């Protein structure tokens, strides 16, 4: 979930091209690693499972430390904990995530794609059950080929 995404991205920003966390927070006091990669936080203001304050604490730390240049964050008014989950059924989500690469100079954030609550009504419309199966790739081979071996 959101906590796991923030924790992993904060720990390994040099190994992750971009991250998107929904309704989370960070388990670490030092969240500065989240400022080293394009990162998008979406949280509903009516979330009773994980209060929006958890995400706001992370954003406030990044802003205070001047590490927010690669950060996008949205507080969706009235959205509960489950509402943002539909984001992962939108093509725009993957267009944004995959528009970033570890090899991008200075790792800029793509601000040309927006995702709002009004997009969620189309979320399941992007699902095509008759689409061909995705090609499976050998992750370690791709990483080595791109020169991102660790």
Where are these regions (language model features)?
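Primarily recognizes the serine-hydrolase "nucleophile elbow" in alpha/beta-hydrolase
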Residues: 1-35
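Substrate-binding/catalytic groove segments of enzymes
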Residues: 17, 49-50, 66
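A structural micro-motif
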Residues: 17, 37, 69-71
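Alpha/beta-hydrolase-fold catalytic nucleophile elbow
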Residues: 22-23, 42, 76
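Short beta-strand/loop motif that positions the catalytic acidic residue
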Residues: 34-35, 40-43, 47
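Acidic catalytic loop of the alpha/beta-hydrolase fold
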Residues: 46-51, 82
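Short alpha-helix in the alpha/beta-hydrolase fold that links the catalytic acid
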Residues: 51-61
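Alpha/beta-hydrolase-fold serine-hydrolase catalytic core, especially in secreted/extracellular enzymes
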Residues: 60, 64-71, 77-150
């Amino acid at each position: 979930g959101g906590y796991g995404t923030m924790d992993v991205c904060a720990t390994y920003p040099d190994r992750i091209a971009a991250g998107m966390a929904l309704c989370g927070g960070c388990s670490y006091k030092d969240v500065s690693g989240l400022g080293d990669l394009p990162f998008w936080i979406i949280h509903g203001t009516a979330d009773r499972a994980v209060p929006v304050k958890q995400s706001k604490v992370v954003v406030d730390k990044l802003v205070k430390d001047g590490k927010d240049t690669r950060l996008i964050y949205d507080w969706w008014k009235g959205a509960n904990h489950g509402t943002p989950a539909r984001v992962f059924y939108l093509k725009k989500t993957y267009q944004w995530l995959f528009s970033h690469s570890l090899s991008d100079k200075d790792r800029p954030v793509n601000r040309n794609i927006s995702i709002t609550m009004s997009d969620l009504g189309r979320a399941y419309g992007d699902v095509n059950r008759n689409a061909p199966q995705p090609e499976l790739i050998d992750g370690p081979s791709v990483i080595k080929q791109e020169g991102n071996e660790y």
